Each structure stands twice: as structure tokens, then as C-alpha cells.
Amino acid sequence: AWASAEPGLHFIDRSNKMSNSWYFARLQATNPCGEQPLEAYGVCTLGALNLAKFVDEDRDILWNKLRYVIRTAVRLLDNVIDANEYHFPEIDDNHRGNRRIGLGVMGLAEMLVRMGLKYGDEEAVVFTGALFETLAEEAYLASVDLAKEKGAFPRFDAEKYLQSGFMRGMSNEVRAAVH
């Protein structure tokens, strides 16, 4: 296994400290690829954005389009939770109770090339940080909008939710919207 970089290491205690669900669902393991730590009977509806699609011919980022697609993707992934048929009642109860979704990305390297940036250079690193901050903030604001429309997920407790390691790192705008 060491010759192919597998198995990877995952520090589940760190995941639990960062997890927004720390107060109602202790994470126990990850899915096979490792991108999603989950609790017992946990599932997560996953989706991905192709970042290369958000650069125009002038090497500019289509920020408004990106924000729109992020918000649409969050709504779509949330709707999938209700459309799913779950084979085990524990999974059904769990997923509908916490409404966990995961919106990831692909195409970062291609996006950087289209922008004329070299992966790993300082400018690319700074841009990538701003990009992922935008992704996270827009996704959380879209989730807040859904909560206003449909109601918060059943296990939501704003005070506890905002105590997670991840939410402590979010902007004041997002934290205020969640509260």
C-alpha cells in the first residue's frame, strides 16, 4: 500500500471538531474516497462544479454565473434528498434529519491555465483561496435561503451549529445569516 500512497490518513477527531453536525452526529468513518466523513448510517448527496466553465475568452472569472450555479446546485442537491428512496429506515431518518450535502469542484487546474496562472504559484494560491471562500459562502447563503423557504433541517440548533470549527472560520455575513 505504501507504494501507491494508500491508505491515506484521516484524523477523525479533527473532523469532529470541524463538523457542523458535532452536536448531534459523531463522525465515525469516511466514504471510500475520503472526502466525506460520516456518522453511523450517514449519507451525503454529492455534486461537483466544473470550474473551467467559469472562465471567459478574456481570462476573466464569470463570478455572477459561478454564484448563480453554486446556489442552484445547493437547491438541486437538497431536492435530491427528498427524491431519494432509502433502503434502510435509519438512513432515511438520518439523511432527512440532517440534510447533509456536499458541493465539490473539479477543473481547478484547467481554470488556472485558462486564466494564465501556474498551479502552485503565489498568485494562483491567493486566487484559489478567494475562489473557495466564495464557493463556501455562496453555498451557505443558499442553504440559509432554503431554510427560510422550507424550514431549517430538523436537527438544526443555531447556537451549537455556529460553535463548529468550520463555522467559526466563516465570514460574519454568513454567521449572521445562519443565526
Predicted regions mapped to residue ranges:
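Short acidic alpha-helix initiation/capping motifs at coil-to-helix transition points
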Residues: 101-104, 137
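Internal maturation/activation junctions in enzymes
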Residues: 69-92, 96, 118-179
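Function-dense linear segments that define catalytic or interfacial modules
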Residues: 3-95, 100, 107-115
